Structures are given as C-alpha cells and as structure tokens.
C-alpha cells in the first residue's frame, strides 16, 4: 500500500513526539503527535522528508 494513502497513526504508546504525516485529503504534510510505538510508515521526522515521500 502507498505510504501516502495511509492515515497518520498515533499508536498505543503515550509519548508525545511531533512528527509529520501526509494527509491525502488535504494534499499536504502536517504535524501530528506520535505516541512512540507501532503506528505506520506515514510518519516522518521532517517536513522535507514527508514532502519527498
């Protein structure tokens, strides 16, 4: 499955890492809070990395 079509997934852990994810419905990358474990591949350290995916 295409990474960019996956919804951003926080995961079950409770850390609060700010990451970037691509939102297909908005056609852009935005910040979201990642819990720190599991989740999916729509999870990037930087806006630039997200935009290049």
UniProtKB/Swiss-Prot annotation:
Pfam families: Kunitz_BPTI. It comes from the Eukaryota. GO terms for molecular function: serine-type endopeptidase inhibitor activity. The keyword Disulfide bond applies. One of its GO terms (cellular component) is extracellular space. Residues 4-53 form the BPTI/Kunitz inhibitor domain. The keyword DNA damage does not apply. The record marks 14-15 as: Reactive bond for trypsin. Keywords: Disulfide bond, Protease inhibitor, Serine protease inhibitor. Disulfide bonds join 13-37, 29-50. Inhibits trypsin. This is Hemolymph trypsin inhibitor B.
């Amino acid at each position: 499955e295409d990474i960019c079509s996956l919804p951003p997934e926080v995961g079950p852990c409770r850390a609060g890492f700010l990451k970037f994810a691509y939102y297909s419905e908005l056609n852009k990358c935005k910040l979201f809070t990642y819990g720190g474990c599991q989740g999916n591949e729509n999870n990037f350290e930087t806006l630039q990395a997200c935009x290049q995916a």
